[in-house]
Amino acid sequence: MSEDHKKQLEQQLWNIANTLRGKMNADEFRDYILGFIFYKYLAEKMEIYANKILKEGGDTFLFSEIDENTATGQEYIEAIKEESLEKLGYFLKPSELFSAVSKRGNHNEDSTESDRVAEDTTETYNTKDNFILEDLQKILNNIQNSTMGTDSEEDFEDLFEDMDLNSTKLGKSPEARNEIIAKVLAHLDKIDFKLENTELDVLGDAYEYLIGKFASGAGKKAGEFYTPQEVSTVLAKLVTTGKKKLKSVYDPTCGSGSLLLRVAKEVEEVNNFYGQELNRTTYNLARMNMILHGVHYRTFDIKQEDTLEHPQHLEHRFEAIVANPPFSANWSANQLFMSDDRFSQYGKLAPGSKADFAFVQHMVHHLAENGQMAVVLPHGALFRGSAEGHIRKYLIEEKNFLDAVIGLPANIFYGTSIPTCILVFKKCRENPNDILFIDASADFEKVKTQNMLSDANVAKIVSTYRERKTEDKYSYVAPLSEVAENDYNLNIPRYVDTFEEEEQIDIENVATQIEDLAADLKENEKLIASFCKELNIKTPF
């Protein structure tokens, strides 16, 4: 697929999203448009798989042509359902396919003028035949119900709960709501997501594009579900350094799941994806995102809970861990955690008002011996004292897990302008006697009000990390002894000197210039005085 075609698809989807924009704010209509796209994806995958089964069985008709009201049709449906639940994790009947519902919702729009006269109606939408709200709600419920008692039940549970089709935000009356939904379905139905071409991830890329667009319009709320793509790329490349395959990848604050999926793009294969997310709506988005990117329901395990207070994967150790936790979030810091294996060995807990190092401790606990992890933190985590200073010292002096500190530009995250950094940890370090410091804070491109890392900026960070090189005013490999001398303060300017000397001023030359200007001024004053005398007017000086 050409880049132009890809951009055209993305613009088409964003235009459809804007059909709902006037009715509600960005994060609300996000849930609807992404939900409808997801429903279309499920339906088309179902149809492709069912048609394949029919073809392999020697049948010449399509899944959508099966008559559900006949005994023979029911036999076909039951047989396909059994295989679909195993392969796809869910099932849709022919009448529940996206294209079928869209056609019903836009029945009169597609009919001829004579058809409309015969039906004795002058409305384009909202006749009895094309009222689809109730049917659509039942179908979304049926998708979930089809998984009950199967291995995929948890992955589909309440997946569409944020799509309230009876919300007055969609329209004041059922007829108005039906009209807007029918329009959205009709527009989506015209778009070819090319799902039959398994080499292309057209829809996955478009979904990520939309998530990013919604994040840019969501302000502070964006941080709940989205890490800018270029930052995700840096994190993903850091934790996959030297790896072609991963047994597992984990994100303890996974948001929409985009960061996990970005890691998968950097290697040939990821066996299993794990994540945890506090926000219920974002948790639903993460599961949709996984399924829509073709991650099989048996290979991802996303949980909804508070990661620090109620961790859901304590028995697991992961080969790669990435995270962009909420900056300096509050947590309970309950003293009972001093007997929790994640925190007990450090002797101190992160303060209740700043959970940054609590997330780091949690991640280190889950890191496999051959694993790598990268986490985004606010700059304060590099130098704040008290308990945080103690934990920082323990991680470096006792554990020697810290591999690199990377300073990022300010204002690259939606909703906050604070400068951030990436800490990279490894349990088995190839360079156990030093820590790499990179100052990439000045390397960015300005896009409207936001700063962004360009492809070149990303490549420079990653290559500097992988080559572990010192570059004037950009990076420095600091011996552990130097870090100890700085009392384990990791503030980057202590290690990377970015000071630019001002050009020396030639005082004698400046004095000569002033004298010359003064002489010129006197000559000009004489000239003006002579003009004033000729004009018989008073001189201005």
Show the residue positions of the predicted features.
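Alpha-helix initiation/capping motif
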Residues: 2, 174-177, 195-199, 224, ...
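A conserved structural/catalytic subdomain of Rossmann-like adenosyl-cofactor enzymes
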Residues: 4, 70, 311, 315-541
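Non-catalytic, mostly N-terminal accessory regions of nucleic-acid modification and defense proteins
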Residues: 1-234, 238-239, 298-307, 407-411, ...
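Short small-residue beta-strand/loop micro-motif enriched in glycine and branched aliphatics
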Residues: 215-218, 269-272, 445-446
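Conserved, well-folded catalytic cores of nucleic-acid-processing
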Residues: 19, 187, 191, 209, ...
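Conserved S-adenosyl-L-methionine
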Residues: 221-323, 328-346, 357-358, 378-380, ...
